[in-house]
Amino acid sequence: MFRLTNRLALSNLIKNRKLYYPFALATILAIAITYIFTSLTLNSHLDDLPGADAIKMVLGLGLGIVALSSGIIVLYANSFVMKNRSKELGLYSVLGLEKRHLFSMILKETMIMGFVTLLLGIGVGALFDKLIYAFLQRIIGESTGLVSTFQVMTIPIVLVIFACIFSLLVLVNGFRLLRLNPLQLTKDGLKGEKKGRFLVIQTLLGLGTMGYGYYLALSVQNPVTAIISFFLAVLLVILGTYLLFNAGTTVVLQLLKKKKSYYYKPNNMISISNLVFRMKKNAVGLATIAILSSMVLVTLVGAASIYAGKKDYLASAAPHDYTVTGTNVDVTSTQKVMDDFLSQSGNQVNRKTEVTYLYFGIKEQEKNKLTIFSENERKVLPKSVFLVFSQATYKQLTGKDLNLTSNQVGLFTKNKILKDQKSVSINGQNYQIQESLNDFIKGKVPNIFTTIVSDYSYLVVPDMDIFKESIKGTATTQSTYVGVNVKDPTHEAKKNSDLLDKLTDKEMQQLAGQTTGVPGPNLTANSRYDVEGMLNGFVGGTLFIGIFLSIIFMLGTVLVIYYKQISEGYEDRERFVILQKIGLDDQQVKKTIRKQVLTVFFLPLIFAFTHLAFAYHMISLIVRVIGVLNPNLMLVVTIIVCGVFFLAYVLVFALTSRSYRRIVSM
């Protein structure tokens, strides 16, 4: 019997190759991608790249997601394969094979499939490893080179991950055999799905959960809380999608059946009857396609937007080659650090900016009346932030004189309410808005709050000392900024950056013992070299992961579509043969098939685009935290991604639909 199960295992894989080809291809690609992610995460050469810590963090996170996604896709593909082999397994049981023999046969099939796919997957991963490493270097802006990235631990990690996945396959298939008798096995592949219960309640629940998920996505305004709300919204939308496909589609089909003028037409009757016959299974497949498609769209839109917007963020976050920023310190401290740096590094200055300003968060707003957080509320995250500059500083930055008098201010604001106001009240002090200003600090002074809040304002006052006195006792912070552009910013950039950090730390040690009556003094130094390296590492790594996660999700989408079309083709073939025998001609068969395929085609796509539309606001807030500050750029990226995905989706469905029509027409 041992030899018999060996021969059967091998012959079954050959006979069922049409079912196993997509399964094997998907598994090989999943293994290859997991191998590449593992190899890159362990690659010692990453330490030589700018932003190495950010790259490793993102790759490590991506490895976990890839491993989980691979497991889900392999399990899903296995369920389709086993469903279509139910009749075959039942026949073996009727012919005398016991369940332990069937289990032994399936175990050997899984071992053969696992060995072959692991061998090929690791081979493909190793083959493209160097090329992918060069691709990662190119994305993060480094010179490409085919550096060997093989790590000893890569193969054991991949083997452990997929050994767990294939072990789970064996357990799932074994449990399937244990709970079904031979008669059930022979009929399992042919039986229709049971009509669900409480369909109307499920439909209403689906609408409610999806609606609340959409509400969460649209109502969040704070980028930090958006990340938390995003996961809750995703879970609600996924649940709502499955409920609506499972129950909502059935309810709609039942309503169409009751509409006699529509239902009692040959094409409509056959299509609707086929969908109703197996709606539960059909609904799960369609919902899965919709969710996977949404994942592809959201991942690509987010990653591509972050990558496309990095130049804008760099210009905003690092307007100068070298900067020193101090909070609650005298301007002489920041000047001293920068002067010592320029003296010791020998850099020649092209442009130098020295600015002192205040910033504070708004606790309450009633039209144009604003209240600042009190001194003991500094740790509260504000919804709106003000940066305050003196009239002299404004002239220094722009070359223009506002000629403000007492109680007059100039204002640039992102606050929608304040844009229409002629005056503003801050902690009970009224000011007339003399002039509405443009963003006068862009490219000159970094605003650290642009990635945290979308509601920020720049206020220009005639006298800074008088203004500070009017808001005494509030959670206000004074910031001093010194930035320089040098003649040759690339010359010894790393060495210069380290020198600036060293001088800043030295000055901080001298300031540590000072008492100012406000939160302790702080000095930070930055170089465009460091900021750009960290940004390229994080953004490039994010795009890299986004691309490969999209491949994984698209792979899952293609698999579900393919197996769904194939399994439904075999199920529908016998019914179409019967219909042809009772008078349905070939043209009507093709028309009916086309109608059914188009219905199945559009539903997941409509849901996916709808999910993306409602998630767009939340995605924009999340990528804002990472530095995407241009909403128009994100919109263009989204349109391009949707267009490319639509074409890919149409191509996949066109190819799989041909298989469906060919099976049905046999």
Question: Could you describe each region identified by the protein language model?
Answer:
Residues 112-256:
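Hydrophobic alpha-helical segments
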Residues 313-314, 320-325, 331-555:
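Basic-flanked hydrophobic alpha-helices used for secretion and membrane insertion
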Residues 18-45, 53-90, 110-124, 202-208, ...:
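Hydrophobic alpha-helical transmembrane segments of multi-pass inner-membrane transport and secretion
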Residues 3-7, 179-193, 570-574, 661-666:
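Short cytosolic juxtamembrane segments of multi-pass membrane proteins
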Residues 154, 231, 235-254, 311-337, ...:
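Alpha-helical transmembrane segments and their immediate juxtamembrane interface regions
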Residues 39-53, 122-155, 211-228, 603-666:
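Short helix-loop junctions at transmembrane helix boundaries
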Residues 1-31, 195-200, 209, 244-293, ...:
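N-terminal Sec/SRP start-transfer signal
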